[in-house]
Amino acid sequence: MGIAYILQDNSVFPDMTVEENLLMGGFIKDKTEESFQEAERILQKYERLRNRRNQPAKVLSGGERRLLEISRALVMKPSVLLVDEPSIGLEPRYIEMVFEILRDLQQNEKKTIILVEQNAKKGLEFADIGYVLVSGQTAIAGKGDELLNNPDVGRLFLGG
C-alpha cells in the first residue's frame, strides 16, 4: 500500500531514456529487482513506451510524456494515485488517451485515483464522487454523473 503523486507540470527527465525514467519511480525502494520487474511489466503493457524504451524522453509527445509520468508512479505499486491536472497542455486526442489509461488503472488494477482537473467535463465524467470548488471552498458535492448533469454546475463550469 502506498500513495504516488503525479505532478501537473512536465516531470520527465528529458535526457534520460524512457526506461531510465521509469526506473526512477522505484529509486527509493529497497527492492530494486522488484522495481525492474514492475518497470518491465509496465513496458509490456504500454506499447508506446515499449517502442521508445531506449530513446531519450525528450522525443516523446506531450501525451506520451504524461503516460510516462503515470507509469513512473506505478513502479512503486501504489494503491492510491494523486493526479494533478492530467489534461493540462495536451491535445484532445491525448486527453482521451490519458483518461482511458486512468480509467483502466481504476477499473482493472483497482487503483484509487484522487484527481484535480481543470477540465470540469472530463473530470466529472471520470469521477465517482466530485467536488466543485469556488474560491477554494466546496460549492457542490455529489456523484460525478449527477454533477455533470446539474444545471448549476453547467452554468458555472461547463458553459451550459
What would you call each of these model-derived segments?
Residues 81-85:
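Catalytic Walker B motif of ABC-type/P-loop ATPase nucleotide-binding domains
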Residues 70:
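Hydrophobic anchor residue at the start of the ABC signature
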Residues 56-60:
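Conserved ABC ATPase signature
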Residues 77:
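Conserved catalytic motifs of ABC-family nucleotide-binding domains
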Residues 96-110:
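Helical segment within the ABC ATPase nucleotide-binding domain
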Residues 16-37, 45-47, 142, 158-160:
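ABC-type ATPase nucleotide-binding domains, specifically the catalytic core motifs of the NBD
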Residues 73-74:
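ABC ATPase C-loop
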